[in-house]
Design a protein with these regions (language model features):
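Polybasic, glycine- and aromatic-enriched phosphate-binding surface used to engage nucleic acids
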Residues: 1-105
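Non-catalytic DNA-recognition/assembly elements of restriction-modification systems
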Residues: 97-154
């Protein structure tokens, strides 16, 4: 770490290497009010696509992706944590509610279907209009599940 802070001097230094090549989830730094998160395969990460990693095997990364992709969590972050268009690592103080096994299964079904639809979109296997229509319905279902999970009435 002799080169830390010395611009133009020394070699490259590695940061947070304990997180290299781990699966996690990420989002783009600049967002609208509604955050869109996704799973991230093994790799090395940078600030353009912020990444987090679950510390508990009881809470799968895809579940946190579901929560972050919900309107409730986006609005919670916008109203109580950070009202800018940047959702950053330090903003990750979102209350994560532990789901029951039944709830976890329901979230997994939504996540799996949305993932399959996005794969079909990228492979041009299905009409994009049909895909977006089904994704909109899944978003509504996800939002309803998250509101119910947090015991919020609209």
């Amino acid at each position: 770490k002799d080169n830390a802070g010395k611009k133009g001097k020394g070699g490259t230094r590695y940061q947070n290497s304990q997180f290299y090549f781990r699966n996690g989830f990420c989002w783009t730094d600049v967002n609208t009010t509604y955050i869109k998160s996704r799973l991230k395969e093994n790799g090395v990460y940078d600030v353009l696509s912020m990444s987090l990693f679950s510390l508990s095997h009881k809470i799968p990364d895809w579940y946190i992706v579901c929560l972050l992709n919900s309107k409730y969590i986006s609005e919670y972050i916008d109203n109580f944590i950070n009202s800018t268009q940047h959702f950053q690592i330090n903003d990750a103080i979102v209350p994560i509610k532990i789901p029951t096994e039944k709830e976890l299964k329901e979230f997994n079904e939504i996540f799996s279907r949305a993932t399959e639809l996005k794969k079909q979109e990228f492979k041009n296997e299905k009409n994009k209009g049909e895909i977006y229509e089904e994704l909109d319905k899944l978003q509504d279902k996800l939002d309803s599940k998250v509101y119910s999970l947090y015991e919020i009435t609209k």
